Amino acid sequence: NSYADETFTNLESVPKKSEVRFIGRCLGTFLLAEKDNNLFILDQHAAHERLLFDKIMNSQGASQPLLIPYKIHTESKSQDNQLEKLKTKLTQIGFETIKKEDGYWEITSIPERWTGTEYDLRTLIFVKQVEPEQIIRSIAAMTACKAAVKDGYYLDDETSAKLVEQAFTLEDPHCPHGRPIYTVFSREQLFELVKRT
């Protein structure tokens, strides 16, 4: 179970005062939990993606050096300026960016969880977005999405419970693309579904 071990090594247990109780897994994609007389159905990919995204955006992700740096040739002064504006933020999320000379840049390290290509990064950097912050957010979202546990991947009980606990600590219960991490059914809604009073 090395993928789960590697992917979830940094998941920390939430203090026991948490009222969340992990119930089980469903359809290889969902985690079931109970809290405050409500049933929560969590999307394991969306929850893990959000946790990774927040870590990346808070500069907690590890970086790894590239044996062969990404080489980026800017095609205009505006692209060069764009990269200059993004340089500090890129470094904060794990992309070590060095300007070799006007029009020539190198990325010498990437976030540990980055699975994109040089082309992916270049496309994200030079996409026609006004705010540099949105570009950084897009890069972090792509990194988190590709690194998050996939649908159909079986998580053991301990890992599932940790993921559920941490999902309930998130300030924003949505993946970086806006999908909700969970759906909630109250006790009353469940009773109504089975025609019980």
List the model feature ranges, each with a label.
Residues 1-19:
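Acidic, low-complexity intrinsically disordered tails
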Residues 18-197:
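Long, charged low-complexity intrinsically disordered regions
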